[in-house]
Design a protein with these regions (language model features):
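Substrate-binding pocket helix/loop in short-chain dehydrogenase/reductase
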Residues: 93-94, 98-106, 188, 199
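Alpha-helical segment proximal to the catalytic Tyr-Lys
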Residues: 122, 166-170, 227
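Active-site helix of classical SDR
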Residues: 117, 153, 161
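C-terminal substrate-recognition "lid" of short-chain dehydrogenase/reductases
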Residues: 129, 173, 207-236, 241
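Conserved glycine-rich Rossmann-like NAD(P)H-binding loop of the short-chain dehydrogenase/reductase
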Residues: 24-41
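Residue(s) in the substrate-gating loop at a strand-loop-helix junction
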Residues: 137
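Conserved glycine-rich cofactor-binding loop
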Residues: 10-11
Length: 242
């Protein structure tokens, strides 16, 4: 049985991804940082269909990530798939931002992706196989007003992924990006109904996305059907960028 590690799996897109892999027969490692109760809910839902564990890990801390990798290896053996869903946002004018705001976003979004890809990537290199899917955002492709730092962090993930795909490809490891559009999660719950309506009207499909929309694409990129796809960015945005 294959094993997937999902960061940011306590809720939102990460939880949906964990459930998708559970339904596909994977062992699932639910990585969370803050909310034990949310992680426990994810674990309860995922454990109904597969073997799963929850591991507390601050992805910006390399020692935490090392510990998570060791726990995963002892519990399940190899790591076959890594999905980096852990992320934070910060909405404000750039001129009002602080160094701490910048560090908060980049430490989780970019440094976290770097740490997990580096340490899980070592395990995948030993096995000469693996799939890595990093979650970015359409703001990493186009940029969002009042989200310059967040957009930059998500753009960095895209550039990082493209480079890593070239680095790991000769060893049978695929590395891709999923760039969600407006997805209905806790991160977007404070967006006004007026703005939501504007987003729906400007997208080709005329609706907002769900975590399950993203999870389905992630599942495809982890499957054998995507063996010849690497270094790519797939937007899951209802045609908003089209």
């Amino acid at each position: 049985m294959k094993t997937v590690v999902v960061t940011g799996a306590s809720k939102g897109i990460g939880r949906a991804v964990a459930k998708e892999f559970a339904n596909n027969g994977y062992n699932v490692v639910i990585c969370y940082n803050k909310s034990l109760s949310d992680a426990q809910q994810s674990l309860n839902e995922v454990s109904q269909t597969t073997r799963a564990i929850a591991v507390k890990v601050d992805v910006s801390n390399e020692d935490d990530v090392k510990n998570m990798v060791e726990i995963t290896k002892k519990t399940f053996g190899n790591i076959d798939v890594l999905v980096n869903c852990a992320g934070v946002s910060d909405t404000r004018l750039l001129i009002d931002s602080t160094k701490e705001d910048y560090d908060f976003v980049f430490d989780t979004n970019m440094r976290g992706t770097y740490n997990t890809c580096k340490l899980v990537g070592r395990e995948m290199l030993s096995n000469q196989s693996g799939k890595i899917i990093n979650i970015s955002s359409i703001w990493g492709l186009r940029g969002g007003s009042c989200e310059s730092v967040y957009s930059a962090s998500k753009g960095a993930i895209i550039a990082f992924t493209k480079a890593l795909a070239k680095e790991l490809g000769p060893n049978g490891i695929n590395v891709n990006v999923v760039a969600p559009g407006f997805i209905q999660t806790d991160m977007t719950k404070n967006v006004t109904e007026e703005i939501k309506q504007e987003i729906m009207e400007s997208s080709a499909l005329g609706r907002l996305g769900t975590p399950e929309d993203v999870a389905g694409v992630v599942s495809f990129l982890a499957s054998e059907k995507s063996e010849f796809i690497t270094g790519q960015v797939i937007s899951v945005d209802g045609g908003w960028l089209s």
